Amino acid sequence: MEPIRIGIGGPVGAGKTMLVEKLTRAMHKELSIAVVTNDIYTKEDAQFLLKHGVLPADRVIGVETGGCPHTAIREDASMNFPAIDELKERHPDLELIFIESGGDNLAATFSPELVDFSIYIIDVAQGEKIPRKGGQGMIKSVLFIINKIDLAPYVGASLEVMERDTLAARGDKPYIFTNLKDEIGLAEVLEWIKTNALLYGLES
C-alpha cells in the first residue's frame, strides 16, 4: 500500500520544521514515517531534523531545489519523486511521508500529484493581517495552522481578528492555533492527522 503523503508549507520561520519534528516525535513509535525536506541551496532543515529529531538518517532526505521553492512542490514537483521512491525502497513498510516545502510566499501550494493532504502554517509574528491577505497556500490547504500565539501580545496581534479573517477566507475548513515550542495545540494537529489523513477510528 502506498504511504500517505502530507505536505507542510508556509513562509520562512513560521515553524514548518518544528512542526515536522514534533509530529514525527509523537508518531514514530506507532507508524513507519519518513520526511522529505525542500531547501533552496542547502539541506539545513534535513540536518536540523537529524540533530534534534527522532528519525534516523535513512528516513530523512533533503532536496536542494534551487531558485523558487514553490516550483519544487507545484510546477516541477518531479524533483521530489526520486526522494520519495528512495524512501519507499529503503522502507517497504512506509506508512506516512511528510514533505516540507522551502519557505515561500502565501501563494505557494502543493501539487495534488505530490501530496494527499496539505497543511499550511503561518506565525503570529508576521502580523494579524496575514489571514486577511488570503493567498492560495492558506486558502487551499486542508488544514491551516496559526503558530506562535504566545507572541501575540508582543507584536500587537489580535488572535480574535486572525480567527475572524481565517473563517472569512476558509469557510468551514479546519484551522488550529498553536505554540509549537510549548506544544500548545500539537495534540489537536495530531488528532486531525490521525482522523482525517490516516482515518483512525473508522470501522473497517
Curated annotation (Swiss-Prot):
NCBIfam families referenced in this protein's UniProt entry, alphabetically: ureG
For biological process, the GO terms are: urea catabolic process
Query: What Gene Ontology cellular-component terms does the record carry?
Result: cytoplasm
Protein name per its UniProtKB record: Urease accessory protein UreG
Q: How does it assemble?
A: Homodimer. UreD, UreF and UreG form a complex that acts as a GTP-hydrolysis-dependent molecular chaperone, activating the urease apoprotein by helping to assemble the nickel containing metallocenter of UreC. The UreE protein probably delivers the nickel.
Query: What is the role of the protein in this entry?
Result: Facilitates the functional incorporation of the urease nickel metallocenter. This process requires GTP hydrolysis, probably effectuated by UreG.
Q: Give the originating organism.
A: Bacillus sp. (strain TB-90)
- Which residues participate in GTP binding? G10, P11, V12, G13, A14, G15, K16, T17
Keyword Thylakoid appears in the UniProt entry: no
Compartments annotated for it: namely: Cytoplasm
Classify the main location.
Answer: cytoplasm
- Among its keywords, does the record have Chaperone? yes
Which InterPro entries does its entry note? CobW/HypB/UreG_nucleotide-bd, P-loop_NTPase, UreG
Q: Name one GO molecular function term.
A: GTPase activity
**Pfam families per the record?**
cobW (PF02492)
Q: Which family does it belong to?
A: Belongs to the SIMIBI class G3E GTPase family. UreG subfamily.
